[in-house]
């Protein structure tokens, strides 16, 4: 069976699937495609490169004299929380995973914050995010907004059902290491503020025995994890940029009637979760496909009610 597009093909597989699909279709780094026995349709070195993500680490602490989610998520107390939820009362089941957000500049010279810290009134067992600990505690999770470290996504066979190789290269850039270390140290300072002293806060991870930067960085690598903000693997850029994959119309360089519309086209990481940015890419991409002209300020005001 052969299927042909009447107008154009739109790929919206995300930062992992889109570059793999292009590579399997013969669009990507020629050396990789030849190694996999894939006929090269167009040598495009940037396909699968520039993978970026938000990498988070966390600090946990135990507390005394106050109930956290941990205390209410087990046994009879959990049944009570479910009952409260069912009758519309305040309950831990109505809480999101984060109740307080903090944005911080790791250097005074920065115009915008480059660090985010999330506070959660609970802690989970290591390696088991769905299982809360039984002792009272809280978590501070932190990550860098605009990491310089980048990795890649590469097909490993010519079989579309085989998963690609994903190498994010977290914290490979020295500036990223500085930022995450400074952010972690700030979290420690927040734990020791006067406002928290009545609750006898005791750091449980990485623990107060970990003090020098090398040890702290090791613990960050040990417990850190993706925030699932993967992007950049089909980056947008001008045709004279050897690593660019799509143009400003989201069309793949050198290929007719083929677009990529998803987070993979972002050339750099945004200072936020990706959801809003991806929604905007989708809205703009839809307008490009339909051939709509960009809105003017007067036209935009006419649409606001």
PLM segments and residue spans:
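Glycine-rich loop(s) and the adjacent beta-strand/alpha-helix scaffold that form part
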Residues: 1-82, 91-92, 296
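FAD-dependent oxidoreductase catalytic-site/capping-region signature
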Residues: 64, 81-277, 285-305
């Amino acid at each position: 069976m052969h299927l042909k597009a009447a107008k154009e093909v739109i790929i919206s597989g995300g930062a992992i699937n889109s570059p793999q699909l292009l590579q399997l279709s013969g669009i990507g780094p020629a050396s990789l495609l030849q190694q996999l026995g894939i006929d090269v349709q167009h040598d495009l070195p940037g396909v699968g490169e520039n993978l970026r993500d938000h990498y988070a680490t966390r600090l946990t602490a135990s507390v005394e004299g106050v109930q956290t989610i941990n205390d209410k998520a087990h046994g009879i107390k959990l049944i009570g929380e479910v009952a409260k939820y069912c009758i519309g009362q305040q309950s831990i089941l109505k809480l999101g995973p984060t109740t307080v957000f903090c944005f911080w500049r790791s250097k005074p010279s920065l115009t915008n914050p480059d660090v985010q810290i999330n506070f959660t009134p609970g802690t989970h067992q290591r390696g088991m995010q769905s299982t809360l600990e039984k002792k009272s505690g809280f978590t501070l999770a932190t990550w860098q907004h605009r990491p310089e470290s980048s990795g890649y996504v590469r097909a490993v066979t010519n079989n579309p059902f085989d998963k690609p190789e994903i190498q994010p290269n977290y914290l490979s850039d020295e500036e990223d290491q500085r930022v995450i270390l400074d952010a972690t140290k700030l979290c420690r300072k927040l734990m020791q503020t006067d406002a928290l002293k009545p609750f006898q806060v005791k750091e449980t991870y990485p623990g107060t025995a970990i003090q020098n930067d090398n040890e702290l960085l090791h613990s960050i690598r040990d417990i850190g994890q993706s925030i699932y903000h993967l992007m950049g693997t089909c980056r947008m850029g001008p045709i004279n940029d050897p690593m660019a994959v799509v143009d400003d119309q989201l069309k793949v360089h050198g290929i007719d009637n083929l677009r990529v519309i998803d987070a993979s086209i972002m050339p750099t990481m945004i200072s936020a979760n990706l959801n809003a940015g991806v929604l905007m890419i989708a809205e703009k991409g839809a307008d490009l496909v339909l051939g709509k002209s960009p809105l003017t300020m007067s036209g935009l005001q006419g649409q606001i009610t």
